[in-house]
Amino acid sequence: MADTDSRPSNFIRQIIDKDLASGKHATVHTRFPPEPNGYLHIGHAKSIVLNFGIAEDYNGTCNLRFDDTNPLKEKVDYVNSIKKDVEWLGYHWEGEPRYSSNYFDQLHGFAVELIEKGLAYVDFSSQDKMREMRGTLKEPGVNSPYRDTSVEENLKHFADMTAGKHEEGTAALRAKIDMSSPFMCMRDPVIYRVRFVHHHQTGDKWCVYPMYDFTHCISDALEGITHSLCTLEFQDNRRLYDWVLDNISIDCHPQQIEFSRLNLQYTVMSKRIINTLVDENKVSGWDDPRIASIAGLRRRGYTPDSVREFCRRIGVTKMDNQVEMSMLEACIRDDLNVNAPRAMAVMDPVKIVIENYPEGEQELLDAPNHPNDPEMGSRQVTFSREIWIEREDFRESANKKFKRLVLDKEVRLRNAYVIRADRIETDDNGEIQTIYCHYDADTLGKDPADGRKVKGVIHWVSAETAKAAEFRVYDRLFQVPNPAAEEDLFSTLNPESLVIKKGFVEANLASAKLGENFQFERLGYYCLDQDAETEGRLIFNQTVGLRDSWAKIEQEQTTGS
C-alpha cells in the first residue's frame, strides 16, 4: 500500500481503508467502464483519475471495460479514442481491455436463472404501455398482464426472443421486483430487449442485448471488482445493482459507491448537445479546443499532468457543484509556467526600421529558453534592421504608466537592445505603417552607459527571418456559467470564443512539433495545432493566457455587481 500520508483523503478512500483494515478485501480492484458511444470529456477524466489513481495508491489493479450493450450507438472509432485518451492521461489498465460483450453468454445464463426462480418474465406490452404502467413518482405502477406468466412459458418466450422470433419492440424481459417501489428503477425494469443490430465485437451472434443496469453489476462481479465507483445519478440504481447480484448464483458482490459528477462552468458535457454543436457547425468537431473533451483539451495544449492535477484539486465529494473554469486554467498555467520553453511571436504586427543599424546585416543573439531554469538552455534569435513588434506596444503619446514604446522615448527589446522611436509613417487612413527608430549599440545585455533608466521591455521578431503564422485565440464557448440551464442554450454562445490572428513567430518555431507547448512571451501559452501538418503552415492554438482575465468577471457575476 502507498504511503497514506501522501494520499488525498476523501470518503471513498476512508471506505477502502476500513475494508482493508477489517479484512473484507485483501486488495483493491477498480474499473473505468465507459460506453463506447462518444468521446471522453473532462468529467470522464475525473473518473479515470479516481479509479486508476486509487488502484495505483493501494497497489491494486484497475480494468478498462467497455460497457458495450447498445450496438446502435457504439463504434470501434470510439473504442480506439477512449483507449488513446486513457493512455494519454498516463494510465495503464490491467491486462487486455474488457468488454461487457465478453460476458454475453454468462449474462444470458443469469437471465435464464432469474426466469427459473420466478424473478423475471417476458412482457409483450408496447413500450408506451409499459411506460404508462410504470406510474410516476407520486403514483405506484400497475402490474403487467404478463407478470404472472408461468416459468415454463417465460423460458420459451425468452428462447424465442433469443432465436429472433420476435420483432424489435414487441417483447422484453423484465425483472420481477416491485411495481409499487418508491424507486422507479425497481418497478420491474427491462433487463433484455430485442435488437437486430450488428455488434462491433460479437457480430451477428446475438439479437437480444442486456440493459446497462443488468450488465454493469454482473460485469463488475465477474471481474472481481471490489469497489464500483460511479456518479451520483446512479445512486438509486444501487438498489437494482444489489438486487441482481443478490438473486443470481455469483460469489462476488462489489460495493457500489457514488460520488458527485464534474460540472464545469462555461461549457457543456452532454453528448447530445455537443453533437448538435458539431452538426450545426458551431464548433469544428469533438476535438475543437473550445470543448472540454479530452481530445479538445489535448489539441488546445493541455498536458496530462495538468488534467490529473485539476482532478486532484477538485477532490471527491457527494455534493454536486459547478467548478470554475479558472481552476482548470490555473492547473495548465502552473504546469506550463514551469515546463514550457519561451519563444517570441507577434500577433498584430507593425514594422520598425532601425535606421542606424547597418543595412543588410544580421546578428544572432542568445535568448534563454526559460528565465528561471538554466538547464533548459538557450536559443539564438536573429536581430536585423527591420523587426516586427505588437501594434499595441506603441503609442504616439502616453502617460507614465505605459511602459512600452512611445514616440521620442525608449524601450528595451527583449534579449536585445534599447531603441528610441523617432518618427512614424502612416497610410491614407492614418494607420501607422512603420515606426522609425534608432538603437543604442552599447546596450546589448546591459544598461545604458550614461545611467539613464529604461523601464519597459517588449518582445519582437526579425522581419527578415520570422515565419508567418496563424494564431487561434480561444475564449469561453458560452457567455454564462451554466449554459445547460438556459432555455435557449445556443443564444448564450460566445461570438468571440475563437479569434484568428495573423502574424509572425521567430524562425526557430519553424521546427515546432505537433502539440509542443510554448510560452509566447508577454502573450500566453500556445501549441502547434494539427492543422499545421495538413495545411503546410504554422498554426498555433492558445492554450491559456498568462493571467486569469476572467477572475474579475466571475467575481462580478457571483456578487451580482
From Swiss-Prot:
Q: Which SUPFAM superfamilies match?
A: Nucleotidylyl transferase, Ribosomal protein L25-like
This protein's GO cellular component annotations are:
cytosol
Q: Where is this motif: 'HIGH' region?
A: 34-44
Q: Which GO terms describe its biological process?
A: glutaminyl-tRNA aminoacylation; glutamyl-tRNA aminoacylation
Q: Where does L-glutamine bind?
A: 67, 212
Under the heading NCBIfam families, the entry gives: glnS, PRK14703.1
The protein's name in its UniProt record: Glutamine--tRNA ligase
Q: Which organism is it from?
A: Idiomarina loihiensis (strain ATCC BAA-735 / DSM 15497 / L2-TR)
Gene label: glnS
